[in-house]
Design a protein with these regions (language model features):
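Helix N-cap and loop-to-helix transition residues
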Residues: 57, 89, 113, 139-140, ...
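Long, charge-patterned amphipathic alpha-helical coiled-coil/hairpin "stalk" segments used as oligomerization
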Residues: 106-115, 119-138
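Short, well-ordered beta-strand core segments
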Residues: 102, 129, 150-152
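Short, aromatic/basic amphipathic alpha-helical patches
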Residues: 49-56, 117-119, 142-143
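Structured adenosyl-cofactor binding patch, chiefly the S-adenosyl-L-methionine
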Residues: 135-192
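RNA substrate-binding interface of SAM-dependent RNA methyltransferases
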Residues: 1-109, 172-180, 191
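Structural alpha-helical scaffold elements that stabilize or flank donor/cofactor-binding regions
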Residues: 95-96, 123, 143
């Protein structure tokens, strides 16, 4: 593994598991106000269904991922698609989502805080928040070219699931208050 390029960004599905557990257990996701995608270093896109409940056991999650990468699809017992794997670059994923704004979250971003980043995300009708799921390092150039503003929400490097928890909580608070920069009360959807 260490001989592969960008080896520090490989081999840590536990980070993705923690991040997904955090995002998929939020009221935003449960109320279908959050869409979640995973983009891999090997240019694979994982689309997550609105009703997915991720296994809490890492070992069950690992088996699920093996099945997904083998079959390109995970279905429920009723036949509903829960996860779908396809080929695509990060730019392809942005084209699929079609957000008005793509916000990166990185320890090397412009210093801010979770509340201000959430307010910025809420200022657009359809925002995407991008959090790196690797042990160390930063976004590749292929990713940064598709990002809009990139922020750091702490003066120390935070783990991906902590960043997700803080940002999504701030988004929930704004939605509960009905804050809308244009004065209307329309529901917003955030992609992560």
């Amino acid at each position: 593994m260490k001989r592969l390029s960008d080896s520090w960004k490989r081999g840590r599905p536990d980070i993705v598991h923690f991040a997904l557990m955090e995002a998929l257990s939020t009221p935003l996701f449960m109320n279908m106000m959050l869409r979640v995608y995973v983009h891999t270093i090997n240019d694979k896109i994982i689309a997550i269904a609105d009703n997915l409940r991720i296994p809490k056991s890492y070992f069950r999650f690992e088996r699920l991922m093996v099945s997904l990468f083998r079959d390109n699809l995970i279905k429920s017992n009723e036949g509903a698609i829960l996860m779908e794997l396809s080929d695509g670059t990060f730019a392809d994923l942005v084209d699929i989502i079609k957000p008005d704004m793509v916000i990166g979250l990185s320890s090397v971003g412009v210093q801010s805080n979770a509340q201000k980043v959430a307010e910025n995300a809420q200022s657009a009708d359809h925002s995407s928040l991008v959090v790196g799921g690797f042990a160390k390092g930063h976004f590749s150039e292929n990713v940064t070219t598709s990002l809009g503003p990139t922020y750091s929400i702490s003066n120390i490097a935070l783990e991906a699931h902590v960043v997700i928890a803080r940002i999504l909580y701030e988004c929930e608070k704004l939605l509960e208050k009905g804050i809308d920069h244009e004065g209307d009360k329309k529901s917003r959807q955030i992609g992560a």
